[in-house]
């Protein structure tokens, strides 16, 4: 894609553009589970749990539906992840208001496992490898509807 304008003959350096992507994954945020190991016939075999595979597929699908281009982010990347957990239906109206305005979600899954499930799912789709993520912010909080908001941006130093 060229950003050079026919009307304005000034050359524009496309390398100065910061590319970004944002999307939401509906449903309860999910932390990446550890690989499982089974032994059969004296051989150990590691596999990824079914729930982790399903969630990573859901992340990929949400990304592809929200981002209308095939461009992969390049260079160092900043990632912001907001994991929103639904307020339990059993709490009172007053407690619900307090949770929504004053309190973060402090139960499992851990922030690092939430980030791992999102970032691993986006390997080779949004960027070549999640090792490109140099800056990471993850927050867990209560909300009306369970979902995970993700914002990725190339880090450019001018």
Question: Whereabouts are the PLM-identified features?
Answer:
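Acidic, proline/glycine-enriched N-terminal capping motif
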Residues: 2-158
């Amino acid at each position: 894609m060229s950003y050079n304008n026919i009307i304005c003959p000034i050359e524009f350096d496309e390398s100065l553009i910061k590319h970004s992507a944002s999307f939401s994954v509906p449903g309860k945020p999910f932390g990446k589970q550890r690989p499982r190991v089974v032994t059969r016939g004296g051989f150990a075999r590691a596999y990824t749990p079914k729930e982790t595979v399903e969630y990573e597929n859901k992340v990929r699908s949400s990304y592809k539906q929200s981002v209308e281009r095939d461009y992969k982010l390049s260079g160092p990347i900043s990632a912001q992840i907001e994991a929103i957990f639904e307020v339990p239906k059993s709490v009172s109206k007053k407690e619900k208001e307090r949770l929504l305005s004053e309190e973060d979600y402090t139960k499992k899954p851990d922030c690092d496992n939430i980030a791992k499930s999102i970032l691993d799912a986006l390997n080779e789709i949004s960027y070549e490898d999640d090792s490109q993520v140099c800056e990471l912010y993850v927050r867990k909080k209560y909300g009306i509807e369970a979902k995970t908001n993700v914002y990725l941006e190339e880090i450019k130093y001018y």
